[in-house]
Amino acid sequence: ADGDYSEAIRLANEVIGSAEFGMEDTYADIFQHGYDSKELLVTRFMKNPPAMDDNVGSLFKMFGGGTYQPSSAYLAVFPEEDPRYEVTFDSLEFTNLNGEKYKRQIWKKHYVSTGDCPMYYMRVAQMYLIKAEAMLRTDSPVKDVVDVLNIVRNRAGATPLKASDYPDRESLMNEIFNENLREIGMENGALYYLAVRM
């Protein structure tokens, strides 16, 4: 049901407690293990596609066809000192048809040169983010919500958040949105629905 945040918490806990899935040891492991990642709940499987474009083509369309790159607003909530930054972004030099070279920032976590580029429609870390949002919306104590966010941040090697840094629930809701950007940004379209709920 719309706005059934208690049920969202229950379902998130069910997945988190399942022996079938689990968090990878590091953020990079998610993308290095690809289809074999224990963190993936839902993905599209196309192992060894006949041509790279069969799998990467849909990624290219979803992420701007190689035309778009992270905006300054996106990068403002994703500091370079966050260990996920290095896993998420890279800068490549391209040469156009006129022989001119230019650099473009790419979504490194999606690109695998072999063509085995899994789609991460939903993974375990997202369950923690959903749980944190639902807890905040059901008036759980700020410290409890921050503790859930820190499970994701600690695995990523990011600096833990402190409850005292959030003087009101709105500032913590903004942090939940930002943490979604950092953790699952450009993976599955979930940020759109989160933005609508905000």
Show the residue positions of the predicted features.
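Acidic/polar-rich alpha-helix caps and helix-coil junctions
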Residues: 1-57, 79-198
